[in-house]
Amino acid sequence: MKLMRIQEMEEYILSHGTVSLDELCQVFNVSKNTVRRDINKLTEKGAIEKVYGGVTSIEKTALVPFENRTIQHQDEKTKIAHYASRFIEDHDLVFIDSGTTTKSILDTLDPAKNVTILTNSLDIINAASALKNINLIIIGNNYKRKTRSFVGMDDPAMLDKYNINKAFMSATGTTLTHGLTNSDLLEYEIKKRISEKAKEVYLLADHSKFGKSTLLTYAPFDRLHCIVTSQPLDDEYTQYCNEHQIGIHLA
């Protein structure tokens, strides 16, 4: 248990760059003394170093800024989003996740469609506000500049009142074992609740997201209704999807 916690703590620090002791206490539900002991182990390993009030990653693997992530596999991401828009139907209530893949999904949406969109993405908010037939519902209390998303909710259970037909989700990584994962605790709360509530969950992910996982699993792989991606999946994914009636669409 202790070794697993230390490993997860290392992954969390590496993905976030710099974190406070208080944040680590909250995320891992342990005391400051326990966090300090775990940090000492990680500093001995050479993965992190102490800074005032917290720790920072020595390795340059912190969460990549939104602008840089947009550049990575940009053509693939745009094609995936444009393809996925065909699944949005008249009178749907859909959730559109934040992320560099989902952000272009409204570019090719038929403007005549009457759709209610629930989102925490600044890019989706901006795009939806230009479409006259869109009913827009914004969630999240605080704006996170690095991911261009609104995060945190006083009561995540408030999402339960929405009958969401389809959720178009992004992920930092996905595997059959760990499912759909991300690295941010505040984003995780929204993603998890939405994935549990939505009738159909669509994963929009370019080829680089498969076969890797990060700290937090917000949905198991078998929760998916459909995957929209850019390249054929490995045989293990294809077989699993066939066995669990998960659709695979190549953009």
Swiss-Prot record:
DNA-binding stretch(es), residue numbering of this chain: 19-38
Alphabetical list of SMART domains matching this protein: DeoRC (SM01134), HTH_DEOR (SM00420)
Domain HTH deoR-type stretches: 1-57
Organism name: Bacillus subtilis (strain 168)
One Pfam family matching this protein: HTH_DeoR
GO biological process: regulation of DNA-templated transcription
UniProt keywords, alphabetically: DNA-binding, Repressor, Transcription, Transcription regulation
Gene Ontology molecular function, alphabetical: cis-regulatory region sequence-specific DNA binding; ligand-modulated transcription factor activity
Tree of life domain: Bacteria
UniProt-listed Gene3D superfamilies: 3.40.50.1360, Winged helix-like DNA-binding domain superfamily/Winged helix DNA-binding domain
Name under which the protein is recorded: HTH-type transcriptional regulator IolR
Function: Iol operon repressor.
Keyword check for Transcription: yes
Keyword Transcription regulation (UniProt): yes
